[in-house]
Amino acid sequence: SVADLIQSPDYWSVMDYGQYMYDGYAPIGYSAYERSLMGWIKLYEPQEPGYISISPFDKATNNPKAVLLRNDENPAEYYILENRQPSTWFPSLMGNGMLVTHIDYVTSKWQYNTVNNDPNRQGYQIVPADNNKSPYNDEGKFSFECFKGDLFPGTYNMTELTDDTSPSTNVYAGNKLGKPIYDIKEEEGIITFCYKDPSLVGINFV
């Protein structure tokens, strides 16, 4: 069915099921995309290969709060990388790590609330690290444990996201995004990775 093909943000976004977290008494916190639309944060768009660190939203550091990887063939299509750590609005039962969102902004879809109506070209979707888009376990029961597998490196220790990995940074416009990330790590609540240059893997950055 179409419902089986469409992958909504589910509990990851307050614009979807996230508003019902804890029966609506503690809805999920705003995503990096939502926070950027509110003007609360600025999405960092790297211009050169290098080593990048992402801090959680509630930590005051010089690191960016979220990273944007734009499709050069279509500036309105991009990936957003953010650091999800347990806090007031992000429950520990959903895990911790880097959440990846694929945005394909088409004005009319946002205007008429049809963002994800087309299963072949969804406008707002989570890229699950375990490549499993279902919140249901092997027994067919809904489980918040399934959400932990969405995060990088997460429960499956997924340390890369490129045009060729599974999941991958596929794009609707053009052939490839061409902006791979390697050596994704999480240490003391900080997400780090090497952007575009695999030769940086293993180098100790301070």
Region locations from a protein language model:
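The catalytic-center signature of Zn2+-dependent metalloproteases
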Residues: S1-L37
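Residue-level detector of functionally pivotal "anchor" positions at catalytic/ligand-binding pockets or at interdomain
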Residues: P198-V206
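Non-catalytic C-terminal accessory/binding modules of secreted extracellular proteins
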Residues: I41-S199
